[in-house]
Amino acid sequence: MIAGALTFLLQTLGNLFVIAVLLRFMMQVFRVPFRNPFAQFVVAVTDFAVKPLRRVVPGLFGLDWACLLLALLVEFAVVLASYWLDDFPFGLAGARVWPVMLGLAAVRLLSLTVYLIIGLTLVRAVLSWVNSDTPLMPVVYELTEPFLRPLRRIVPMVANVDLTPLVLFIVCQLVLMVP
């Protein structure tokens, strides 16, 4: 019972941190202005881990590889700790288990990225109806527009309603179904 609660806490806190690191990476890739309060919060939450790693892992091709590596390492640690708390026999599994665990962490990282895209798109849709002047809107707009823009060329507006977020939800759900 305690192991289940610890696993839940570990996965929740670990995944929240990984989402913050992924947000930071996406904000850099999509050139989101960092003067926004939400962007400053994400940077403040992740700086303690990203800055030291940046000294070791350089950026390449305009991408901050330190953020991606950090997200993968944290997810790897969460996977290992979760299996350890569930009494997985690491000693019997041998050295072949480590690449499998790393692959599982990579798949979970991709899954979290897709869920992040779904969440950001949902926030954008709700904010467009409720309060489009909130300081969060420019960040959410810049993070979701690269995914919605290509769909707008394919999906026409129906009665002045943009259905591309719905199409993006469906595409993301299909991606999550792929084994």
Which residues does each predicted region cover?
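Selective transmembrane helix interface/packing segments
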Residues: 1-179
